[in-house]
Amino acid sequence: MAVVSVLQVIQAFTKPSRRTPVQVERGILALLNNGEEDYLNGARAFAIHPMANLSHTFLNLEGAGAGGRATLFRSTDAEVTKWYQHSKRPFGTVVSGDGFKRGMVKSQTDYKVFTENMGMRGLDVAFWEPRSRYHTTDDDVKHTSKESLWHMLGTALETLQAATSDTSREFDHDGEIPAGVGHEGVWFDCMRPSQLIWS
């Protein structure tokens, strides 16, 4: 589902339509990688590629379940989380990120490499329902829904539209890392479909 979402985002940004007009102030680098289950090697390989130096921020699309709504479960800071707030149906809470920080969640995502090894700022979005189907024979297209796909795709597209149209001085324009440091924040969805962020 994340791969389909990324491919559709690429199409939306390269062939804008009346329905998805896109004005870009910042570029997008789409990364489709593998090797997550073997020590995040796909992200580690990207980290040593010359194009990695062009990246400041990221939106990581994941799957830890077979459907439901895509949830924002980790964010580096309040500033990048505000991009996610632009989506029509944001879903997520800072509490899930606390689970990772406290070691309650044992698995990892490329978020770890992007933040710890590459110094980027960004967001981790994933499916988490039903978690019991993750990495089983039921973790397939037959056991998910179009609504789940549309939720991930919609939030990804709207988040990236906000990120690429951001003209603030928060992030450098020179194409080189460092990406700066954001402010810690508290965020959660409230009385759907809105999201609140405090920093």
Each language-model region and where it sits:
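Soluble extramembrane regions of membrane proteins in the secretory/endomembrane system
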Residues: M1-W198
